[in-house]
Every structure is written in C-alpha cells, then in structure tokens.
C-alpha cells in the first residue's frame, strides 16, 4: 500500500487574502447577529413603552380597621368628612412613597372613593414611568409596617387588604360579540407553507398568519401588522358604541350605559381620532357621569408616542383641547355598577394657528383650561376645581369670576404632598407684541407653608426670564396681579406654582390680555401675613449640664406652649459627697401623655426616682448621689405651658438626721427607743420596727433553717428547749410562710447570743435572752409554703390573649384586672392579701394619684362587674422598680398596694413567688392569661383568655427581636410559627409556670412586636430577678 503522500492532491491551499476574507466574513456574521439581538431587545423595550406610555397610573385598595369610622357622608366627595379623611390618607400614602425606593418615580396619589366595611379606600397612584404593581404593593406594605407616616399613629391598616390593580394599558379591548374572538383568543393558524405558527404569551397573529405582535399593539392607531389587520376598523370597533377610527372634521363617540366587564376582568373601549395635518382637536362633553372606578383617559397622539393629557371620571370636565391632529381616547371599565349613564363626546377640528394672543390667553376656566397647556415636564399638574379646597387652612373657598361655589378656578394639586413640586401652565406660542399688552390675572396664596408663584416668558431666541413673582402667605383673599408684555419675537408665557410639602395650595383665575400698557392698579398691593415663629427644637437645645450657680431651668418656650414630640435632658451636678434637691416652681403638663422623669445618677445605671405629669404642684425630689437626670418627654398632641424648676446642693438633703445610739430609726425618719424594737407592738407609724424581727438562716431553702429573733437590734439564735408545734406554726406565720412542717433539735457550734421561747397564756411568744442553750441544742425549723398558686375551682382541660381560648370561671384566681379612671387598661397578679405585681409601664405617668386606680379581683367577664365572686379594691400606693428604664423597657415591674386587704375565696387566691433567681428552662410550657386584644390593634376580650406558650432562651429571643436589647431581667415566650401571644391590654398580667402542683409567677407581661407574629415572641419581666424586692413589701 502506497503512502498518502503519493496520492495526488485534489485541493489547493488557500491564499493569505482568501483566509483574510473568510475571517472578515465570520466577523460580519457575528456582528449582524449581535445587531439583530440588540434590535430585538430595543423593539421589546419599545413595546413595553408603548404599553405603558410616559407615565403610569395604578389603582389600589386598602382597609382602615381603626382610627376612622365609616359614615354615609363619606360617599359625597364634596362633604367635609370625605375631604378630611381623603386628605389624611393621601398624606399617609405620599409620606410612604416619598421615603420609599420608588420616591424618584412617584408623583402623587388621589383618593377616589370610600366604601363601608370598616373603611375601604380606593385610590390612584401616579408614577412618571412604569413600575410593576407587585413593586408598588410591596413598597406600600413595607412603609406601613415601618410606620413611615405620622398618620399611622392614628390609622391602623389591614395589610392583607392592600391590593394594587394592573395599569390601564394592560387590559384587553372590548369588541362587539361578532369580532371579540379575534382579540381574545390566540389560535395557531396555517401559513401558506402549511407551517403552524403559535404566538408567545401576550402576543397575537396578524390576519396574514405570518407575524405575531404584542396584544397591546392592536387597535393603538399605528400599523404594526404588514397587512394592517391590527388596526382593522371591524376588529377594533368598541363594544361601547361600535366605533373605533374617527376621521372626519367632526364626529362623536360615546359610552351610554356602557357594557360591564365579564369574568371579573377589567376592559377597555378605545377610539382613535385623526383630523387633517396641522389641525387640533376640541372635545366637548355633552354629558359625563361615570363610576369613580371607570376612567376615561385622553391622550395626545397615538401608539407608543401618545402622551396622557387627562384622566376623567365622575364629573363633567368641560371642554378639553388637544393641540395635535391625533387623539387616543381609552375608557377603562372596572366596575359592574349600573346606575351611571356614561358619557357622550363630540369632537371638532380647529386651527390653533388662527387664534390671536388674546384668544390664546383669556380664560376664566368655566368651560375648561381654554387654550392653556399643562407643562408635562413638571412635577405635577394644575387642577380645575370649584368650591373650597381641603384642608381649609389653605386655598380658596370660591372662585373669583362668580365669587361663589358654582364657579371654577385652577389650583396646584390640593391635598397633602410629601415634597416640593413645581406645577407649570403654558400658553401656545404667542405673536410678538410691539404695541405692548397687559397680562392680568387673579391669584390666591393662603396658608402657612405657601411657597411661590412665578410668571415667566421664554422664546427660542432668548433665555427664560421671570416677569412676576410672589412668595409667602397673602391671606384669605383673591389678589390682583398684572404685568406689561413687550416682546419682539414669538414667545410663550408660563405660570409656575411652587408647592411646599403640605398646606400650600396656590390658585389662579380670570387670566386675560388687553391692549396697551398696564395702568396703575386700582387694587391695593397685597401684604404678607406675618410668618409664624420657627418650630421649636424638640431636644430643647440640649442635653444640658447644669452646675451651681446656674441652677434654674425651664421647658423650652416657657411659659408658652412647649413643642410636641420633645425629648429633652438636663444633667444636674453637685460636688462629690453632696446630693441634690430638685424643686418645681411651676408645673403644667398634658396629663399622662407628657411627663417629667427624674433619675438618681446619670446614664444606664441611674435609678428611677419619680415621674410627674399633669398640673402641679409636685413634690421635691432628692438624689442619693451627686448627680441627677431630668427627662422631659412629650407626645404629638396637646401642649401646655411646661415647667420652671431649680435645684440646690448640699450634704444629706432630704435625709433625716440619724438617731442616737440607743434609738431605732423608722423608715420615715422617726426615732424610737431601741427597747421598743421587735417587742410585739408597733411604735413606728409605718410599722417598720416590727417588720423584720425573725428570720431563718443556714437553711437549704428560703423556708428552712435555724431561727433567729432580733432583740434591740441584736440577732439571737433560738434554743430547742420548750419548743412546741404551736411555736413552729407561730414562727412560720411571722415569716410570712405557712404552718410548721417539722422542727428538729441540732447541736450548737457556738455563735450566740441565744433566746428561749415560751408561749404566754394569751398565745403570744415570750422571748428570754440567754448566753447558752440547754445541752447546746438549737432548733432547725422547716416551714410549709403558704397556700398559694392553687386552683380551688375544678375545671376541665381547655384546648390550646391572641390565639387563646375562653377560660373557665375561677381558672386563674390570682389574675387581676386594673382600671384607671374606670377604663380597663392592664392586668396584675395577686401575691398577698394586699399587694399586686404589675408592669411599670402600665403605671408610668399614672402613679401620682393612686386613688384613680382600682383593682377588680375574681373577675371572669369584663362586662359583668356585679358578679358575686368579684371584689373591688382601690389602690393607695404605687411603687415603680427603681431600676426601671422606660426607653430600654428594662426592669418593667411595679408593686401596687390595695387600700383594704382582700378576702381569699375559691375565686381569689394569691400566686406563688419563685425562689430568688429560680431558673425556668427554655422549652418549658407555661401559661398566660388576660383580657387584652384578640388580634393586633383589635378589640379587647370580654371573657378572660388563656393560652400556653413555650419559653425561649434569651439568645434565641435576641435573634428574633434584634431591635431590642433582651437583658437578663427579661424572659421570652412564644411559638416560632406565631399565632399565640399576649397583646395590648394584657400588659402587667402573669406568665405562669406550674411546679409541684403550684403555679409560680415566672414573668410579668411587658412588650412585644405587634402580636402573635412568627418568630416574634412576647417579652416578660423575669420575676425571679425581683423576688427579693417583691418580698420586701410583703413581710
């Protein structure tokens, strides 16, 4: 076999030029492919622009579940009720979107209607470019959740009710029944080559079955199908009146008792008007009456380049002029209402170039905007309106032409706004005015925040110049303005209203042009309303550090009203070793809502001393250290005069003089002879001389140990000699425990002095001091716990407050309902016959008059306060834990003393206190109970609710509540899935854990994030951290 080299070659090698041309050819093919791809993407972008135009309008609904009440007046858009609520809702929506990720696209909002069902709000949102409905909805929900509007303090919105509907141009066109299938069904058709073509979603085949185009390109006035079938008059004829393309110099279209959408979808009737090139189109509305949700949009032009010029619903807009020979009219039908007659529009063509300057300018706005044009490059549009605008603190109450509510005028957008806006109105091009002419007009600039009105002239040859300008508040009246025009080239006049964020409407009426120079005005030149003083700083210019001799300070603006939402700090200082006395010379605050809090020391380690509110006078406050912090905190409502205070420093201010060595000092500072201490008879007015006369020590629990008695300030150990069971019971009861359980003699290892106990004939204990016990025998006493934490009413087990169930009567006999000024506000737990444990935040600012509080014990149904099981007690003392910090929500616990001791019954029993620092492990199931809200921001319960919740570790709780600092003084409980939780109104109530058939108070309901959300547990004050503090009040 010969080699391959011996076979003659049938191909020759390519030359260098041939290789070069081949490479170039490949590159050109690649470039063509890239250009095709880019063109395709560009076409798709154009299609999208065609669908949505230069601006985008979305319609939304939401439900107000509290903060406003529905009434029939809300159906009347001219009523004060409608205007007030619409203003506040628009303010809320504007606040949210102007602080959102869509703030650059967002323009404004408009409330259309209120419906019953709590209150359902229907509104429109306008954006200057297309945004997805999903994105709009997400931003709105996030803004409400983040409380991005001050209106959300008042309104509570049902987040699940929020819905944003698709934009106008996404709806299908309604056609007559004979042709509707062509627009609503995409069917594969056979091409001449027997090739079946199926269009992608949102596209349809042209009639030639060779090309697919976007559905939105059908019936838009521009030919997109090669055969023109997308604009076929039969295909596009509307179901409203059977018309589509209108081409005469005059004609009409209508939607009389217009058809309703089917299958719960919205629909559109669309008309295209074309007149001769160079002409414009005037639309006269013979009648117009549509439901608020059914909107007629008027566009200048057609197809992808059309510009939205007007959105119309409900009321007759008068005459609309479009300065183009093409108009697209699109009627969006969303409702199924049948009580509206619809509309009829007659159009005529006219030549705007035949108008003179006077015809182009003169306008009283009674029939529309005349020949004035909205400046679409600005932030918003002028509104044609009549009657008063809302709120009444800005804008006119009537027009200038007629001087009553029947006449029309134009105004910058009424209602709230979240940013400054420029709103422009332009003339058509005007002819030069060498003979001079006088432009006159009437303007209305009223409101504290009104900004500026400017009139400018512009031309192609010269830069824009300002010929008239006013700034500020000129009061509640129409003012006359005039300026002479003297232009040598074609020019335009523009009116610009500059709108501030709120309460800043500017109105115009009766614009006219007359021959000749302006004469001296017979109307007086308006004067500015004095500007109100600047807003006061909410921090009072602080924080302030004060030392002697600079010892007097006041709330800001005293004796005039202080600012709302203030948070002010004064740090008072004294030399080391001294303390501080704070005195309020004058004191007048809004009761409860505005407070002055005084703390001992500075910073996080400072201790709570007092909180004052309402009218004075108030008591002096003394520090125990050389520093004192004064906090002034106000809400966003009513403001009063405030306060004037001073302080002095010294040694031992407010501290009683110490007693002599042979005296005992009572808690109130009184001195009594030492021999009277622990003698069985109270000599101190506060009973403190008999409060701590017996104790247990060296025991394994707080209910066992050796017994000690205090005799004249010296502790004596009890001997076992003569000890009896009765003495055990007596000593255990003196300790605040139950009966004696056992007493065992034990050998003494020294450490006297000692005391022998005997029982007197009257049953009292006789104490005899001794230097030694008989046979060195001491008594080791074990007491029973006092009866507590026991349910005495037999009940069935109920199934597993929010997510809870009605409890049975007597199920939780220690749960107490707290009323302030006869309003049920919080819960509490009974821990003895005369003391309750509750939350500090419940009584904060409400502690100055304890008698305004009452406790209802044995309550089951809040609506039945006459039940025989109930006992009601007034409160005569409130003690807030000195470590409580309201801002950090730490140590949120307080004691409340009943004016009269309560009797224990089957329905009234105390709950047990846990051991000091007792541990309740994570995962343990405990119980909560209360009459609080059944859902977040909902109504409170009538029947006492109960539920079980698992405890969480503080580490996990911190992860789930990252915005709070979860301290060792807190315990958390709740399910990861949510659904069960304490809520508003449950504050101060118990978190209860069962142990050894007794219920222990493990926590006090403190705070949470809303109620029962997933991974959002409730947070409670951890009671074992406060057991010793609580017990100090009980014994």
From Swiss-Prot:
EC number in record: 3.4.21.9
Disulphides: 199-212, 206-225, 219-236, 240-269, 540-568, 659-671, 666-684, 678-693, 773-783, 788-912, 826-842, 926-993, 957-972, 983-1011
Topology of this chain in the membrane: Single-pass type II membrane protein
Domain CUB: 240-350, 540-650
One of the GO BP terms on file: trypsinogen activation
Ranges facing Extracellular side: 48-1035
Coarse class of the protein's main subcellular location: membrane
Alphabetic keyword roster: Disulfide bond, Glycoprotein, Hydrolase, Lipoprotein, Membrane, Myristate, Protease, Repeat, Serine protease, Signal-anchor, Transmembrane, Transmembrane helix, Zymogen
Domain (MAM) ranges: 358-520
List of catalytic residues: 841 (charge relay system), 892 (charge relay system), 987 (charge relay system)
SEA domain ranges (all copies): 54-169
Protease recorded as keyword: yes
Catalytic activity as recorded in UniProt: Activation of trypsinogen by selective cleavage of 6-Lys-|-Ile-7 bond
Protein origin, superkingdom: Eukaryota
Positions glycosylated per UniProt: 116, 147, 170, 194, 233, 263-264, 404, 456, 486, 519, 550, 646, 698, 722, 741, 762, 864, 903, 965
Topology feature Cytoplasmic, residues: 2-18
Quaternary structure annotation from Swiss-Prot or TrEMBL: Heterodimer of a catalytic (light) chain and a multidomain (heavy) chain linked by a disulfide bond.
Designated name of the protein: Enteropeptidase
